[in-house]
């Protein structure tokens, strides 16, 4: 795998607030290489979620360019952006959003099937990930039969199921108690490092942020290395 992960070049974004434009991002720059985990910190309302949406090709910036696995996304149409996102991106949210009627392994198999992976190969990949997350014995359980920490670990496996080049996570342990959050985060770091993914993780937890390779802070619409 080459070192291309995620690059944000001079990202700008403003929103209408009455008659005025509220500038949330004023030229944010960031580069994350394969195998690197970067913490994104800053107060609520600073623009972290907006930055993640733009990095994940869910929202277009007003200016600047997003490079995903070395591919510039700005000039692409929506169909091409969706294809690029499905091919190279994994997402983890604060709430797991698992399908309640599916078992843990089925939740991890599904995105692979959508991507055209044969079912047998998809199940093999799902069991590999669940095993690395210490969930092999819980693979046939539905989300309602799992603890909060187990549910979030399944969500992490699902995000990495298609071997993305970039992982984006928005407060992935924010809905868990401190002890559970610590354990889930340990598993997340180990799995991401083992996969060689470039990861950007938004968190309000300074202890978790300090365990990542780098910390960048949203400050007045810019990204500042801490």
Curated annotation (Swiss-Prot):
SUPFAM superfamilies assigned: P-loop containing nucleoside triphosphate hydrolases
Compartments where located: Cell inner membrane
Assembly notes: The complex is composed of two ATP-binding proteins (LolD) and two transmembrane proteins (LolC and LolE).
Gene: lolD
The protein's name: Lipoprotein-releasing system ATP-binding protein LolD
Family under the similarity heading: Belongs to the ABC transporter superfamily. Lipoprotein translocase (TC 3.A.1.125) family.
Pfam family, one: ABC_tran
EC number(s) on file: 7.6.2.-
Keyword Manganese among UniProt keywords: no
A single GO cellular-component term on record: plasma membrane
Binding site for ATP: 42-49
Gene Ontology molecular function terms on file: ATP binding; ATP hydrolysis activity; transmembrane transporter activity
Domain ABC transporter: residue ranges: 6-226
Membrane topology type: Peripheral membrane protein
Gene Ontology biological-process entries: lipoprotein localization to outer membrane; protein localization to outer membrane
UniProt keywords, alphabetically: ATP-binding, Cell inner membrane, Cell membrane, Membrane, Nucleotide-binding, Translocase, Transport
Function: Part of the ABC transporter complex LolCDE involved in the translocation of mature outer membrane-directed lipoproteins, from the inner membrane to the periplasmic chaperone, LolA. Responsible for the formation of the LolA-lipoprotein complex in an ATP-dependent manner.
Keyword rRNA-binding: no
Organism of this sequence: Paramagnetospirillum magneticum (strain ATCC 700264 / AMB-1) (Magnetospirillum magneticum)
